[in-house]
């Protein structure tokens, strides 16, 4: 049984300087499960929903890879988390994490807490719900990005942030319009 973090080590190789034939690159089925968008500080959490990349653990626990893309300067290009999900007890935890930086072409262990959590961290709760409530993904506003290789996923980061920032700006404009209508006197 492979660990998603070990499986995702191939991601670093794909993104490095080693040439890889595109047909042989492992692919995942990626979904945006949580995002926080603001100008220059956007974060997006993606889950690989490919059933072949979701691992069964003892006790009914499932393990899945979650990717954090962080737009802030000085942050790694992305962080890969190995997340265990316990649907029965409505909890999730991180069991491993790696930061990838394309500037230095490095892969380093990232800090994380391995404590079981309920809803304390929205991205972790959404990752749990992605696995435990697959029929509700659209209702939970999870966006399907599609099937792609890890290298394609990493290259899509800038476009993803453009889209998320545009959506955040749109939502703010709509909120301001709604506030303006609320403040108008009734006739």
Regions found by a protein language model. Name each.
Residues 1-9:
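Bacterial N-terminal signal peptides that target proteins for export
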Residues 9-15:
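Hydrophobic helical h-region of N-terminal Sec-dependent signal peptides
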Residues 17-19:
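N-terminal signal peptide c-region/cleavage motif recognized by signal peptidases
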Residues 22-82, 86-187:
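N-terminal secretory-pathway/extracellular module detecting exported/lumenal segments
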